[in-house]
Amino acid sequence: ALRRSKETPSVLICAGTGCIAGGALKIYENLKNECESRGLPVYIGLKHDSDEEKSLHVKMSGCHGFCEMGPLVHIEPMGVMYIHVKPEDCHEILEKTVLGGEVIDRLVYHLDGTAYPKQEDIPFYKKQHRVVLENCGTSDAEDIEEIRHTSYTERVNVPNAAARIAFN
């Protein structure tokens, strides 16, 4: 599994069907090419067998649930969520946000004149308690050990009474 610190920047491109239909695969390719053309020490993809730390991680993630705003790009550790991203935005995202720490206002969610750069502050997500999608973009779906430790079954909380009935 990929070993990286909490400070290692991660660019997560939503790979849900809506985002893919909107061009997410081209966004992924453009970000990958931008990184490679700059010679950035970057890890591209989900599975990483080396212990070597990289300065940037670019990967496709599961659906973020905000399909009508896709394609979505989520940048960690900043927590920034970009909406309606186009392939031609990749250079600016890499330059300004990933390398420069600057938020690109035109790519963040706006509602009633208020900008919401962080996913956690977007009203759509604000009152959600994510259970199944809690690890979306952070867990590696190709790593069986990680799946074992972050599986859906761990997320299920069966009340004691129901468990007694089911197992008696």
What positions do the PLM features span?
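Feature of Fe-S/electron-transfer and energy-metabolism proteins
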Residues: 1-168
